[in-house]
A protein has these predicted regions:
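ABC-type nucleotide-binding domain
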Residues: 1-227
Length: 227
């Protein structure tokens, strides 16, 4: 998380190797990603950019683009998790409904949900959501992320966000400020130790919401201890 222009997208774009690191390295399962063929690397990734990308065809071909041999059940499950079925089911042709090049015949939120469904249907090792929830209303955002958390429990999930509510319950939050890491930790830890994060949180959440989030995290830790 961080303000516009702080380097969030630049950082995650290093993972699919849109460009390479100039120092240090990025490893996946202990292997430097520069030693992996680009095609093989990207097969392991489910990447959803800031602006959803759709192709001419139909809804089904767009969702299953990264999993051409997948089943209808996989497609429907991905659409359900991405909260896309609510508008797909209203269309006469359902999953065979045509999509124009660039998705010009669907709304921004619908385009984003289909892009998210495509990533889910791919069953990737690593999900990268680059501010992918910004076009969604708050209720859809919350419902989608809850369903996504259940589905992606065996994968690494990286979420770039400007809305603090999107990353509130992440295992680890990285705060960027002017291209540098300003803090790392949970929501509760960062509220105490990171002025940049605290400023973002207080500008977006009410005192009541902040306290509720802290209580949820505390309860979650107690459950883990007693469990």
């Amino acid at each position: 998380i961080g303000s516009t222009g702080c380097g969030k997208s630049t950082l995650v774009n290093l993972i699919p190797r849109f460009y390479d690191v100039t120092s240090g390295d990025i490893t996946l399962d202990g292997v430097d990603i520069r030693e992996v063929k680009q095609h093989e690397l990207r097969e392991k990734l489910g990447y959803v950019p800031q602006k959803g990308v759709l192709f001419s065809g139909d809804i089904a071909s767009n969702i299953m683009f990264g999993n051409s041999h997948g089943s209808d059940d996989e497609m429907i499950e991905a659409a359900e998790i991405a909260q896309a079925t609510e508008f797909i089911d209203t269309k006469p042709e359902k999953y065979k409904s045509p999509i124009s090049q660039g998705g010009s015949n669907v709304s921004g939120g619908q385009k984003q949900r289909l892009s998210i469904a495509r990533a889910i249907a791919k069953h990737p090792q690593v999900f990268i959501f680059d501010d992918s929830f910004s076009a969604l209303d708050y209720k859809t955002d919350v419902t989608l992320r809850r369903a996504l958390a259940e589905k992606t429990s065996g994968s690494t999930v990286l979420i770039v966000a400007q809305r603090i509510s999107t990353i509130l319950h992440a295992e680890q939050i990285i705060v960027l400020d002017e291209g540098k890491v300003a803090g790392k930790g949970t929501h509760a830890e960062l509220l105490k130790n990171c002025p940049v994060y605290r400023e973002i949180a207080e500008s977006q959440l009410s005192r009541k919401e902040l306290e509720a989030a802290l209580n949820e995290q505390t309860d979650g830790k107690e459950d883990q201890i007693h469990g």
